[in-house]
Amino acid sequence: MLTLLSLPPAVALVSGFGLALVLAYIFTGLIGRLARRKGWLDQPSERRVHKVAVPRLGGVAIFLAFLISVLLIYWPGSLHEALVYEGFLPAAVFITAVMAYDDVRGLPPGIKLGLQTVAVVILMLPGLAAGHLNEHGDIISSIHNPLHIANIINSDTLEIPLIFAIPFTWFWTVGMMNTINFVDGLDGLAGGITMITAVVMTVISVLLGQYAVAVLCAIFAGSVLGFLPHNWTPAKIFMGDSGSMFLGLALAVLANIGGAKLATMLLLLGIPVLDVAVVIIQRVRGGRGAFHYDKRHLHHKLLESGYSQRQIVLMFYGLTSFFGLLAILSLVLPDALPFVFRTSIAGASLAHLIGLALVGLAMIFILSFLIRRRRPNKDQPVLTTSQPHRESNL
């Protein structure tokens, strides 16, 4: 277990969260002012919907707050967590730095995908180097078996051969980074969803007795929460790709470091993941690139239907919180939940997963109903967001 510099777990958790929150709030304000002086702004144009120039480097502030808090609060003690630590921090430094350059200068989508791949390679290197010790660090080499209770495969854990674990880790990590990137379409949306997810992961880690992982999740939650006041509509600063890519990378790692949380992460981010998957399929079927800019995402459609930014963001906050509560209650009161909600963090039956998928589809149906039910006021502009995607936002 991580040695938290002799701090009691509760003290480390609270102090880590508080330190990260304060640092992120201060750094975001400072970086916003620096970006304005240097002219590192997202300028309004016909292809954008915001009306004033806004800095896009908020992700750098989030990362710096996280990094400083992590270095001050804990140190890895076990081999697994040391390998994760050795891979995650360099990968986070790399992806934040290169995407900060993208926020300032701009990079084509192919280059950005290549840089994401480099970040994943950095993430996996310590685990690859220690493979002879049967310890793969950030490489996802096993998953909990959802078919165990159905007696399809009689094992709680499915071991993934390294030849498949490497591409699976790439797909999971790059997919998570781009999911958060695509969700970053309204002020406060990506940051708030990520913060709620991190808080839920903190609670679950505490319930599972994984206090070191809980501290890491709490620091991450505090870093994002400290940024949110600056990003709430109307935003004074955008997180940019430096922020969305770091947030996605961190979520991908946090789901793996504690073990048994990949399914939980998919539950919490089920709506954004389904939304991104559907939009990408529609783009590809329409002969466009997967990362071609359009307004097919749920938050775009809700915006065009007349809902305000705040209403839409709060809808997504509510959905994320709802699924987070289900995940927590499945540990605290598993027998009190309806059958389809009893999703064990240590492994769920196929029926449970199907039930949860149906719940997710029901949420999509509700959002679709809201889109059809309300129509925009003709006297008001339809698009009010100040955080647009770029045409090739990856």
What role is predicted for each listed range?
Residues 29-54, 278-310:
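Cytosolic, membrane-interface loops and tails of multi-pass inner-membrane proteins
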Residues 298, 377-394:
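Short, highly charged, low-complexity non-transmembrane loops/tails of multi-pass membrane proteins
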Residues 70-76, 324-338:
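Juxtamembrane "helix exit" motif at the C-terminal ends of alpha-helical transmembrane segments
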Residues 2-276:
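"…together with the soluble PPM/PP2C metallo-phosphatase catalytic core" -> "…together
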Residues 306-331:
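Alpha-helical transmembrane segments of integral membrane proteins
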Residues 30-34, 366-382:
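Membrane-interface capping segments at transmembrane-helix boundaries
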Residues 346-367:
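Small-residue-rich transmembrane alpha-helices that serve as helix-helix interface/gating elements
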